[in-house]
Amino acid sequence: MGSEMCIRDSCYTMYMQQNNDVLFNLLDSHDTERLMNRFHDLDKFYQQLAILFTLPGSPCIYYGTEIAMEGAHDPDCRRCMPWSEIESKENQEKIAMMRKLIMLRRNEKMCRSPHFHFPDTYENDRCVEYIKLDEEGNQIEVLLNASEEKVKVKGNGKILFAREFDGEILGVNGTLIRRI
């Protein structure tokens, strides 16, 4: 497990900090398959967005991603926005989730901070945890369960964003962001 953490840390530190600060981060675009098309799973979809909104740089959301719009490689990824469906309950729930992530990034300084590390708390190699810190020492934990097993969450903190989390167990493809 330790060697994987070294690889994760070294990938980020290979670049000068001024480069990391101005990264333009995107998960889908007019030239790529849409994010939802890759997973066909909302929990995995929101895991990816949680990473996007908590890493250094500027998150970029392609139109339609806020409603988990599907689309294969170009030109299918350039489908028209389904405006007639935007008010549906399902789409409004997805938009609300996106707003939560946007507000989290806006309101929690740690989400925008370039300072983070991988503490190696969990035995499961498919459970990714990183801690974001701001200049005052405030911290948030981002925990993603990409394994096929549920994970018992260690410690506690104020939950800022969660999917597939019951207060103790992080489910398969679950996401937890909390202030610690």
What are these regions (language model features)?
Residues 1-4, 8-74, 142, 146:
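Conserved alpha/beta catalytic core and glycan-binding cleft of carbohydrate-active enzymes
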Residues 8-9, 56-61, 65-180:
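Carbohydrate-interacting/catalytic domains
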